[in-house]
Amino acid sequence: MSAPDRILSIDVGTQSVRALVFDDAGALCARVQVPIEPPYYAPQPGHAEQDPDVFWQAIGTACQQLWAEEPALATRIAGMALTTQRATSVFLDASGAPIGRAISWLDQRRAERVPRLPAVWRGLFSALGLASTIDTFQRLSPANWRAAHAPEQHTRARHALLLSGYLVHCLTGAWRDSVSAQVGYLPFDYKQRRWAGRSDWKWRAIAIERDQLPELVEPGKQLGALDKDAAETLGLPVGLPVFSAGADKACEVLGSGAVTPETACVSLGTTATINTCRDAYKEVTRFVPAYPAAMPDAFTDEIQIYRGFWLVSWFKQEFALDTVVAAEREQRAAEALLDERIAPIAPGSDGLLVLPTWSPGVRIPGPEARGAMVGFTDVHSRAHVYRAILEGLAYGLREGRERIEKRTKTPITRLRVSGGGSQSDQAMQILADVFNLTAERSHTHETSGLGAAINAAVGLGWHADHRAAARSMVHQGAVFTPRAQAVAIYDRFYNEVFTDLYGRLKPTFERIRAIASAP
């Protein structure tokens, strides 16, 4: 029997769990996707919850299906790594049992009462103009919500984890998690890549104690090994090494090969993001941290559109169900049909613009944010709306590029595109034209899973370090070149309309918010 020569990556998203097998050159050898249905429960408006065991059971189902399809594959697995959605919180009691459902990253609930910061911190944040930002940070904290609204559950909580930490415990029995998974409302020191120091204000702002949090492990290091129960659930041998990787976006950047500052990773996922990776810590937005990269001693500069390609799902559900049905009948993706329908429409959608700020933010956009469609005339069709959504997301990501370049003084000269939306040729071409840069797909759209696999490959000693592994395991796919005429049109719409559209509409959004929230 030959030595194990494959890596298992588990990618836990909001809507599905994927079990992926890669080789040492980054080729995707096998793939199973198990849907999470429903993706979450909303017992009240703004809430988003899911039973954490649903994710664990889906991992087992996906793995067992892999081995059923290719029985010899399980014996070839040398190690595994995990990547998950960010900022989904799980609380467990002393026995390790979840207390209630996991609070999803999509959740918008706010705690009515939060811990009161010492006067010195309140004064400092007020002087810096950060009082509202810190208040929002506290109110969005799942731990603070539990303390205020479910005190019995809060008192019982022995462990406060992100979904990644919960799943690491399910796999290994250890209370550990990846450094690069710590994106959420936690007392984490992003610059030092560790839990905050004892005197840090975050311990006074969030109702979490240090002993409730897991041990953190750098990417590429071993988190533990499969225990007996996990091995049985996954159909793999006891003792299989489990390596630290990172959150989905961090792994996506690594799995796209965007490991130097001049290369940007654009992720066209539920949340659309633009990231660059660098060794130096730099806050692109003032007082908004750079996140730990999925490799040691590196950080990602990230700008996000919270409701990114979620807008595509929203459009299909609300305005294009007939297209979805037609696509199912033809056994095609609905996005492929929509691509065909928008192809004849000229760049700029005949003057229809979408401002993709569908969800409020903390700083940019602010809590008043609303989405907008501007420029309707009688020539516009549903296809125009769809194209304008893709263009609006591209404009928003270009704005993110310019903020990153301005803050870091590093020009972005290369665009690697990943996420489900990258499978759309129209979305790729629009990005190339709006950015006036060549847009490159990776050889696989499973870039988060590939980023996790790179970490396992480094941990197994197959490659010297993360950048060397990325050079060997990430390969260029299809390339989309900017078209001069489209670039000129998009430049005018971006510079003359889009860049100041939010500022012009902000007072209107504030008035809408005041009226809509009035009793």
Annotated model-derived regions:
Residues 1-34, 78-116, 220, 276-519:
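Glycine/Thr-rich phosphate-binding loops that ligate phosphate moieties of nucleotide
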Residues 12-14, 25, 126-247, 355-359, ...:
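Gly/Ser/Thr-rich active-site cleft segment
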Residues 26, 50, 78-84, 103-106, ...:
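Active-site nucleophile and cofactor-binding loops and adjacent substrate-binding regions
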Residues 32-74:
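N-terminal phosphate-binding loop and adjacent alpha-helix
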Residues 45, 53-56, 69-140:
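Active-site phosphate-binding/coordination module
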Residues 53-55, 119-135, 235-236, 262-265, ...:
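A polyampholytic, Gly/Pro-enriched intrinsically disordered region
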Residues 59-78, 150-154, 199-209, 232-234, ...:
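Phosphate/pyrophosphate-binding loops at sites that engage ATP/ADP/AMP, CoA/4′-phosphopantetheine
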Residues 189-296, 329-336, 340, 401-404, ...:
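ATP-dependent carbohydrate kinase catalytic cores
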